Amino acid sequence: MEFSVKNGSVEKQRTACLVVGVYEPRRLSAAAEQLDKLSEGYISTLLRRGDLEGKAGQTLLLHNVPNVPADRVLLVGCGKERELTERQYKQIIQKMVQAVSETGSMEVVCFLTELHVKGRTSYWNVRFAIEAIQESLYSYNDFKSIKPEVRREFRRVIFNVANRKDLADAERALEHGKAISTGVAFAKNVANCPPNVCNPAYLAELAKGLAAEYDNIRTTVIDEAEMAALGMNAYLAVSRGSQNPAYLSVIEYKNHPNPDAKPIVLVGKGLTFDSGGISIKPSDSMDEMKYDMGGAASVYGTMKALAEMKLPLNVIGVLAGCENMPDGNAYRPGDILTTMNGLTVEVLNTDAEGRLVLCDTLTYVERFEPELVIDMATLTGACMIALGAHNSGLMSTSNVLANDLLNAAEQADDKAWRLPLGEEYQEQLKSNFADLANIGGRLGGAITAGQLLSNFTKKYVWAHLDIAGTAWKSGVAKGATGRPVSLLSQFLINKANNQ
């Protein structure tokens, strides 16, 4: 898909399909008003006759509009002008995609980017439009022997901005929107891949692929022998029951003007399949446990977006690849594990494995002397119960970092909600036989999981994103979401802008 921006007059657009908005009730947007004048009231006459009310998502395709050089004019309902939100705007763009795809048009000139979205600028309108279009066109059919009939997709979208002075921002939005959409798609592809293909070795190969593609990326893969030498016993315990060995993939992106600048480190839980181990999960929906590597997928997608945007930062992405399976060699409830930093953990439930993989990974990344560390993981069902499928759970030992992430989440429309940490939650992690227990009981399960991780982050600024509710969708819309690639990408954009 080719995207571009311009500042032009709606009356002069020679294109296969010209798209303008109509507000509710039957109110023309500025671009639609200009077309109506050019067509001598043709559009307003149709609205008076009741052909389109202007409710959000309604569409009306017109051919041969008098005096208009475009082959087609698509009217898109935008709802009430003063109530247009980011969510509604994206839905409107996706309705446009659906309608245009049924016409056979190869090119679209879109004036919907001129709409006023609450608290947003032309930059956001263009970027959100690209993200919404790419989201709408995404499909994953790699393993279907009979491919679905592919609709004839348009190949080019030209976004119009109302003011010439906004063109530079719109061009920047193009760059960011395309890069972030690519990162989201890469994350979704990896997460949707079946676990008999996507195992820890597969994640390691993907990480190596980034290094082969980009000159400023270097990848190092840590195997189980090296993990054992490092004392990563908690990580290795989780892997013991699987025939697929664990691999820790370290992706180093260096593009800061100061090559010695401290890196931002992103850590992703990469459980390519989580059966629960000896504490085995119920069979219902166990197939969705291929998504337990959603954290690693989002780090991979973010590193891809980062490289495409060429941001002047030093960033390290870490994919903690592992598989949790039951067999005669699997770790057990009651086992006590000595972690890389020396703390011991009693295993009360082998299905609380992600935190064991992460605690050693979070210790491992100390060697990079990071500016900050953000880990993301499909960690707890408790977070899904608390926040549902709309907000990722955020925990942090730093108010500054937490606020920066919440700001990026709001900007990117990739929402997060902060949950507390504190010594009172540490009490729930007490063990009679070890320094820590790997679960803290039913109450506050998402928080106690984050609190456990905090014991391994004392040497740097840290935040944790629990994406168990946001990394994928179930039911008829089953599939990975690519979250929180947009949030992380925006966080990195902000970091680059403010240094």
Curated annotation (Swiss-Prot):
Pfam families: Peptidase_M17, Peptidase_M17_N. Keywords: Aminopeptidase, Cytoplasm, Hydrolase, Manganese, Metal-binding, Protease. GO terms for molecular function: manganese ion binding; metalloaminopeptidase activity. Mn(2+) 1 binds at D274, D351, E353. Its EC number is 3.4.11.1, 3.4.11.10. It is found in: Cytoplasm. One of its GO terms (cellular component) is cytoplasm. It catalyses: Release of an N-terminal amino acid, Xaa-|-Yaa-, in which Xaa is preferably Leu, but may be other amino acids including Pro although not Arg or Lys, and Yaa may be Pro. Amino acid amides and methyl esters are also readily hydrolyzed, but rates on arylamides are exceedingly low; Release of an N-terminal amino acid, preferentially leucine, but not glutamic or aspartic acids. Mn(2+) 2 binds at K269, D274, D292, E353. GO terms for biological process: proteolysis. Its cofactor is Mn(2+). Presumably involved in the processing and regular turnover of intracellular proteins. Catalyzes the removal of unsubstituted N-terminal amino acids from various peptides. Belongs to the peptidase M17 family. This is Probable cytosol aminopeptidase. The gene is pepA.
